Amino acid sequence: MAYFLKQSTYSRGLYLQIYESYHDKNTKTSRHKCYKKLGYVSDLINDKVSDPVSYYKNEVKKLNDKRNKELEEMKIKKIGEDPTRNFGYFIVKDLYNTLELEKELDPFKYMCGFSYPISSLIEALTYSRIINPCSKLKTFNEVIPYLYENYAFSLDQIYDGLNYIGSEYHKFIEVINYCINKKYGRNTSTSYFDCTNYYFEIDFESDDKQKGPSKENRPNPIIGQALLLDGDAVPLNMRMYPGNESEKPKIRELIKEMKEQNNINGKTIQVADKGLNCGDNIYDALIHKDGYIFSQSVLQLEEKEKKWVLLDNDYEEVKDNEGNLLYKIKACVDEFPIRVSNEEGKKVIVNVKQKRVATFNPSLANKKKIEINKLVEKAKGLCHSQAKKEEYGESSKYVKFVDEDGKKASVLINQDKIDKDLKYAGYNLIVSSEINMSKHEIYRVYHQLWKIENTFRVMKSELDARPIYLQKRESIYGHFLICYYAIALLRLLEEKVYKDKFNTYELIDLIRGFKLLKGEDKNINLTKKTPNVTKLCDMYKFNADYMYLSPKQTEKLFTYAYKVK
């Protein structure tokens, strides 16, 4: 097997392609296939490449040197090769089959010009991400080779493919959405939105890696990720953006894109936390005949509204079965002013009719008061030790730095701020366009936001989404597209296939736990028997708990298609 530069003469000129030779097991002869189309020599000449033929001959030499090195490493590795294989990803592969994703992704091979199907690469990277999230180099060496099925990609093909899907990530999201809509439909009566960001261990900004407000309070450059979920908590859309951009406009962009791509004309209620609550987002939802349920900071309300929140009048107590107070809730409907941008970009005041739902949670109040008192104690200690301003961190909000006529600033405890925060601890406010929705329903819908927070948690912890080893923007976006596919398929399994019989964490444990020793005529199942393994096998009559699995029995696990009810 080797690469070579193919030179073809046409009427327009000399056309270059990199070809790959390989051994055909069926015909037992050497064959060739296109690895990469380069183009006409006249089009390839630029400031950096004066002689395309010589340049790409050198590139081919690099490819061959790299392949030879990989082959040598594989020979060394074969001495102690582990026959253990993971086959648990059949759970996700069967959903991939059900959605017919391979068929819908197949046309991309005509667009990208690769010699391998892009669908197979996405499959291999998605399954690998769920099984063992790690760098692409480690995925190539230590994860893909130990999948039960054979996914034969070179490291260069993985990087090239990742770069391509990153450059077109919105199209790949459109494809999986089409497949989900076709098989399962979508609940878009409500949509949940939130943003997060990921930091990079670099000092200088580049591309979309820009310095901005980090969710982890780090000074490093970050990249932003906006995520939209449907009413069943299955991902609907994703947008990556530079770390120095505001997250507030992203909800409008994603809702608009989601409706256009899925031909949705009906109303969707946008649900988001106070970070996304601004006049422009509220006004945009209303003019597009959508609704919204946002939280709002009680501390930023006008004084008369704060008084209404604190008044005990009209609060209804909600208790558990043992009579313990869970929370108090009340609501009002009125016209409230919001600031929106007009056509000239200037802010103007517009009155909108809103339902406002105030709540008081005693356990949250106790938690907040403990946090406030800890910060106050820290601030007092730093005051006594004459610490520098930057050492205060979050506790700085409870001190005042007073400059005494050009002399060194003195530090005073801000008792007014402390008293204010303690007074409003445990109180929350939700604002909504849904006048006719009950206060309890608004409260319930808003608190489903934990699902999107949990989605980010799964992506960051279980799928290890932070792209530590990637630098190019397209490769980073490709990495997040793989994470998006992984979480979308897992959520779909949880909500639509298994109907909450397994949560996402349990599904990941199941997938990682199914292992076998691969043999010639039989496979030995190494999977530990657990209640969830038994439940899964009983539900779908899978034979994945047998001690011995023939190759035919094992392969059958990967060809199952879930019934769509």
Region roles according to the model:
Residues 223, 237-240, 290-445, 512-565:
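An anionic, glycine-rich sequence signature occurring as long contiguous blocks
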Residues 218-259:
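Electropositive, glycine- and tryptophan-enriched low-complexity nucleic-acid-binding patches
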Residues 442-469:
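Short amphipathic alpha-helical "interface-anchor" segments enriched in bulky aromatics
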Residues 26-27, 134-140, 150-152, 200-203, ...:
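Short helix/loop capping segments that flank catalytic or ligand/cofactor-binding pockets
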Residues 246, 270-280, 298-300, 474-476:
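Acidic, metal-coordinating catalytic cores used for nucleic-acid/nucleotide bond scission
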Residues 118-119, 131, 154, 184, ...:
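Secondary-structure capping and boundary motifs in well-ordered enzyme cores
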Residues 1-207, 227-244, 527-565:
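Dynamic "connector" segments at or just before major functional cores
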Residues 25-27, 146-153, 184-187, 231-234, ...:
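Secondary-structure transition/capping motifs at alpha-helix termini
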